[in-house]
Structure formats: C-alpha cells, structure tokens
Amino acid sequence: MTATASPSDTKGAAAPRISFVSLGCPKALVDSERILTHLRAEGYELSRRHDGADVVIVNTCGFLDSAKAESLAAIGEAMAENGRVIVTGCMGAQPEEIREKYPNLLAVTGPQAYESVVAAVHEAVPPAHDPFLDLIPPQGVKLTPRHYAYLKISEGCNNRCTFCIIPSLRGDLVSRPAGDVLREAEKLVKAGVKELLVVSQDTSAYGIDTRYATSPWQDREVRARFYDLASELGELGAWVRLHYVYPYPHVDEVIPLMAEGKILPYLDMPLQHASPSVLKRMRRPGNQEKQLDRIRRWREICPDLAIRSTFIVGFPGETDAEFEELLDWIREARLERVGCFEYEPVRGATANDLGLLVPPEVKAERKRRFMEAQSHVSLRLQRAKVGKRLSVIIDEAGPTGARGRSKADAPEIDGSVHVTSRRPVRPGDIVTVKIERADAYDLHGIAV
C-alpha cells in the first residue's frame, strides 16, 4: 500500500509544509496517520509535491527485499526533488543500510517512533508558535477515503515464524487498552466512517500480553480480549472487518457474532501453507486437516462467511509432493479470497538457514498453478452469487456507474462490485445490489 498525504484547505503563508509518503501495510498507514495528526495539530500544512515542502517524511517498509527496494527508491525520489528528508518505519530499524545509500538524510528512525519523527521535523523546520487544533478533525488525519478507516489494536508480535522479521523490527505484542480502541472507533464512526478495518500484526492475540486487562468504556469495564473487543465494536453501527487473524482456537468464538450480523462475516486469516512439514519449517500451526474441520463448522454457523488467506509457494525445501498437498487443500477448503506469494528471502529471517532454495522458475510455475486452481474455486463461488441481493459499500461513483465492495471484499486486496444505478450514489453509501454477472474476482449488478 502506498499513500501520499493530501494538502489541507488552510493557506497560512508562514506555516511550514510537510510532504509525506507512506509505504507498506495498513498498520504502517495507521502509523503515518498518527504522525500527521500530531504535526497538523502543531500547525504544519501538507504538500502534495516534494518540491513544495520544507521537509519530506518517508514511512518505509522493510518486510521483503522488494519492499526495501521500493522504500529506497521513494527516499531517492524525495532526495532528488527536495533534499531534506526524514525516514521512519520498518526499514528504519536498519539505519546503516539506508545511510549507506543516502548519507545526507536529516534523520532515520525505526517503526512506532512517533516522538522521534516529530522531534526530527521540529529540528528541520520548527512549528508555528500557536497550535492550530481547529485544523484537526476529531478522528485525526486519515489517509484513507472518508468512509473507511484502519483501526490498529496492538503493536508487535509474539510469534516467531521463520520467514518473518517483524518481531525484530516492531518488538513483541503490546495491546492497546480496549477503552482507548473503542473511543477511537467511536470518534471515527461519528465522523462518518462506515467501515472499520481492524488491524495489527496478530489480531487474535489481542490482550494476551496484558492478561486481558480491563479498562473503562462508557459506564463499564471492558476486557482487552479478542471476542470482547469484536463484540463491542459491533455495537457502534459500522461495518467491522477483522484482518490478520492467527488461527488460535478462540477464533471460533467470533463466528456467532458474524452470524448475528454484529460484525462482518469476513475473516482474514493468513495460513501460509497446508503441508504439515512445510508449516513445521515455517513454525506455523501444522494441522490443516483440523483447520478444514473448523472451516466446515464455521460455515455451518455462518453460511455467508468469507475467508481470505494468503499462501507462500517455494518455501525452502518445498517438494513437489508438499506443493501438491497445498493444491489439494485449497481445492477442498474452497476459500473465497486467496493471495499467493513466491517465497522471497528476507535478511535476518531464520528461514535463510534452512537451505534447499527452490529455483525461481519452479516458484513461478507453482504460483501460476496455485492461482489457476484457486481461480476455478473463486469462479464457482462467485457465480453462486448471481441473482442474489448483496449489501455493497460504494468506493467510487461516476455519472454512469459506481464501484464498491460487498461484505466479502476488503479494500485494495479483494474484488469489487461494479454497480449500475438509476439514482445518484456517493462514496460511503451502502446500497442493495442485485448481482447479474460474475467473474473470478469481481461482481456486476444493478442497485435496487
């Protein structure tokens, strides 16, 4: 995900101007929003152009080497167009790699280093004397469209997957108090947000680090626990979508909330593979037969459940037989939304010590076969929706039609619903659409 801050409508001649680039995942986007909210409260304005800013901030991604390359390219562009650049984010946890290429950066800070970023901005271009708190909407500065927002509930991760370096970049799990999360969510909904996308590194581990500590919310105490938070969010009147859910046993508890309509019947659960031996090398839960049984039970409880997952092909040592296990599993699981990535070595990941690298051409062929198998599954599931009426949230609207998403579709990573409507619709509207046509990823219908 890449986001660039938009300028405000305020034209203070003396106000310092910031250009901002946000790279990486939705969790990083929330970090960017937090930094921008702080700076806007101090009177800084936002510039669309690097060359029109007093300083440029680049929030980097350092998860994969390809993401690092994108981050370095963005830094280079900012240096070329402006020259006064502050770097933050996951790649900032390895400053020597950045400084080696760009030694003249103003500052390099790691992830979640909000105060350090703000301090670096202050040093580069001091804020105006008087704060402009009236410039800040109650929900803070957001880089998403007005009708949806990411809600980060924790930082860090306690898992030690061998392909991942997130714990070394962002640390162990640190959960936010439930009351704080709910107050932020309430502000967002009051400001017009129709969809809350709950994110973290490990959403279903929420509260484990605090032993499910309680905190005040309205007139009662609420536990920092996955189920409790999901239930309370479901009372706010917005769509609630759960992302990055690790398949712990207690995930079963939220499925009835989906069946009752309190939260969306959508579960983003990165499973990574299906072969027990590959999962063991990944240090991931290894009983995918049991996982199939769980998915069947979930669908019995909530027939409309849409499961999104991501998988890695070409993990070190992956054999033809292990890959065939994965293909067999996805055909049987019939997941609604699936992504696939070729394994990419990450500097510092313990998977690098496994050896037995899969050749690039084999990884590419396995990804092709995987996506081909999943496309047949997806097409069957999509065609089953033809003739049905679905609730669709509108993302974009034009004179002849609109594009939106069903409850089974998250922004940017899933498909779309293309809507024909006789009456005007606007982004954020939730309309009923009769589905007339389907392909493997998108639906087409008419507003009724």
UniProtKB/Swiss-Prot annotation:
Residues 383-448 form the TRAM domain. One of its GO terms (cellular component) is cytosol. PROSITE patterns: MTTASE_N, MTTASE_RADICAL, RADICAL_SAM, TRAM. Binds 2 [4Fe-4S] clusters. One cluster is coordinated with 3 cysteines and an exchangeable S-adenosyl-L-methionine. Keywords: 4Fe-4S, Cytoplasm, Iron, Iron-sulfur, Metal-binding, S-adenosyl-L-methionine, Transferase. [4Fe-4S] cluster 2 binds at residues 157, 161, 164. One of its GO terms (molecular function) is protein methylthiotransferase activity. This is Ribosomal protein uS12 methylthiotransferase RimO. It comes from the Bacteria. It catalyses: L-aspartate(89)-[ribosomal protein uS12]-hydrogen + (sulfur carrier)-SH + AH2 + 2 S-adenosyl-L-methionine = 3-methylsulfanyl-L-aspartate(89)-[ribosomal protein uS12]-hydrogen + (sulfur carrier)-H + 5'-deoxyadenosine + L-methionine + A + S-adenosyl-L-homocysteine + 2 H(+). Catalyzes the methylthiolation of an aspartic acid residue of ribosomal protein uS12.
